[in-house]
Curated annotation (Swiss-Prot):
Keywords: Cell projection, GTP-binding, Lipoprotein, Magnesium, Metal-binding, Myristate, Nucleotide-binding, Sensory transduction, Transducer, Vision
Region G4 motif, annotated ranges: 265-272
Record function comment: Guanine nucleotide-binding proteins (G proteins) are involved as modulators or transducers in various transmembrane signaling systems. Transducin is an amplifier and one of the transducers of a visual impulse that performs the coupling between rhodopsin and cGMP-phosphodiesterase.
Keyword rRNA-binding recorded: no
Family, per entry: Belongs to the G-alpha family. G(i/o/t/z) subfamily.
Location(s), subcellular: Cell projection, Cilium, Photoreceptor outer segment; Photoreceptor inner segment
Ranges for region G1 motif: 35-48
Residues involved in GTP binding: 40-47, 175-181, 200-204, 269-272, 326
Domain G-alpha, residue spans: 32-354
Species name: Mus musculus (Mouse)
Ligand binding (Mg(2+)): 47, 181
Protein name: Guanine nucleotide-binding protein G(t) subunit alpha-2
Length: 354
C-alpha cells in the first residue's frame, strides 16, 4: 500500500499556505501603515495641514472641489467683517468716516437677510466701504482683543477678486478657509512606501473627549501650536490665554502613559503671523518673566523651550520641533518630509536596525 497524501490533505495544505501568505501580506501592510494623530488646541492650523496633505500627497483640489469652498469663503468674509464691527462697539472705537455708521447698520441688516454663503453686490459694496474706513482698520489692528479669523485681512484685501461673478477659489483661498472641525476626520495617503492614516480631531475643549478613541496604536503625534496666539484668549473661555492652554494640553499629551513609545513632533505654526506680531507686541504679555530680545528668533526659541521643557522623559524621549506656516505648501512639504524620515528612523530603531 502507498502512503500518498489524499486530495483532501493537499487541499488543506494549499489553503493553509494561502492563509499564511495572506497573514504575511496583512502583517507587511500593517508594518507599512503609519497612524498619525494631529492634536492641538483650537485654531492652531491642524485642518490646514490636512488640506496640504491632499495638495502634496494626493491629487490636490479639482476645480469642482475648489468651487465647493466658495460659500465657506463668503461665510468667512461676512463673519470677519461682522466681528470687527461688533468689536468697535465693545472697544469704544468710532468710525473715521461718519457715514460708515449707516454702512455698519446696513451690514447687520444685510447679514440677517442674505442667504448663507452668498455675496450679493449690495453686501459687497457695504463691506468694501467699511473695510476702507480708518476706524475699522484701527479696530482690526486690535484683533487680539476679540475673536477674528486669521484669514480676515487676506480675504478682505482681495474682495474684488473673490466677489467677481466668475470667481473660482484657488488653492491658497481653500487653505485659508476656516470651518470648525467637529468629530474626527481621517485622510489617507502614501509617502516613501509608507501608508499614512492621518486623523484630525477638533481642538476646542468640547471636542477633546473624542480623542481617546484614536489613541491605540498611534505611530506619531503631530502637535500643532500657534506661535501667534501668545496674546490671544480662547474662543470657549475668554479668561484663558491661548498659548497657556496649548502648553497645558501639550504637557498632558507628551507625558501621557499612552504615548510613552509614540514619536511626538511639535509644529510651532503660524510663524508668518508671529513674525509680524512680535514687532508690535512684546512676548512678556504671555510670559511676564521673559526679558529677552523681542526678535522673531529669540522670542520663537523661548516659546519652543517652554514646550520642550515640559517633556519629563528627556533621557529616553526626544520631541522633534519645527517652525511652520501651514498655508505655505513648500514649507509643509519640506517639514513633512522630515517627519516621514523621523518615523522611518524610529521604526528602524524598534526593529534594532538603527
Amino acid at each position: 500500500m502507498g502512503s500518498g497524501i489524499s486530495a483532501e490533505d493537499k487541499e488543506l495544505a494549499r489553503r493553509s499556505k494561502e492563509l499564511e501568505k495572506k497573514l504575511q501580506e496583512d502583517a507587511d501592510k500593517e508594518a507599512k501603515t503609519v497612524k498619525l494623530l494631529l492634536l492641538g488646541a483650537g485654531e492652531s492650523g491642524k485642518s490646514t495641514i490636512v488640506k496640504q496633505m491632499k495638495i502634496i500627497h494626493q491629487d490636490g483640489y479639482s476645480p469642482e472641489e475648489c468651487l465647493e469652498f466658495k460659500s465657506v469663503i463668503y461665510g468667512n468674509v461676512l463673519q470677519s467683517i461682522l466681528a470687527i464691527i461688533r468689536a468697535m462697539s465693545t472697544l469704544g472705537i468710532d468710525y473715521a468716516e461718519p457715514s460708515c455708521a449707516d454702512a455698519g447698520r446696513q451690514l447687520n441688516n444685510l447679514a440677517d437677510s442674505t442667504e448663507e454663503g452668498t455675496m450679493p453686490p449690495e453686501l459687497v459694496d457695504v463691506i468694501r466701504k467699511l473695510w476702507k474706513d480708518g476706524g475699522v482698520q484701527a479696530c482690526f489692528d486690535r484683533a487680539a482683543e476679540f475673536q477674528l479669523n486669521d484669514s480676515a485681512s487676506y480675504y478682505l484685501n482681495q474682495l474684488d477678486r473673490i466677489t467677481d461673478p466668475n470667481y473660482l477659489p484657488n488653492e491658497q483661498d481653500v487653505l485659508r478657509s476656516r470651518v470648525k472641525t467637529t468629530g474626527i476626520i481621517e485622510t489617507k495617503f502614501s509617502v516613501k512606501d509608507l501608508n499614512f492614516r492621518m486623523f484630525d480631531v477638533g481642538g476646542q475643549r468640547s471636542e477633546r473627549k473624542k480623542w481617546i478613541h484614536c489613541f491605540e496604536g498611534v505611530t506619531c503625534i503631530i502637535f500643532c501650536a500657534a506661535l501667534s496666539a501668545y496674546d490671544m484668549v480662547l474662543v470657549e473661555d475668554d479668561e484663558v490665554n491661548r498659548m497657556h492652554e496649548s502648553l497645558h494640553l501639550f504637557n498632558s499629551i507628551c507625558n501621557h502613559k499612552f504615548f510613552a513609545a509614540t514619536s511626538i513632533v511639535l509644529f510651532l505654526n503660524k510663524k508668518d503671523l508671529f513674525e509680524e506680531k512680535i514687532k508690535k507686541v512684546h512676548l512678556s504679555i504671555c510670559f511676564p518673566e521673559y526679558d529677552g530680545n523681542n526678535s522673531y528668533e529669540d522670542a520663537g526659541n523661548y516659546i519652543k523651550s517652554q514646550f520642550l521643557d515640559l517633556n519629563m522623559r528627556k533621557d529616553v524621549k526626544e520631541i522633534y520641533s519645527h517652525m511652520t506656516c501651514a498655508t505655505d505648501t513648500q514649507n509643509v512639504k519640506f517639514v513633512f518630509d522630515a517627519v516621514t524620515d523621523i518615523i522611518i528612523k524610529e521604526n528602524l530603531k524598534d526593529c534594532g536596525l538603527f
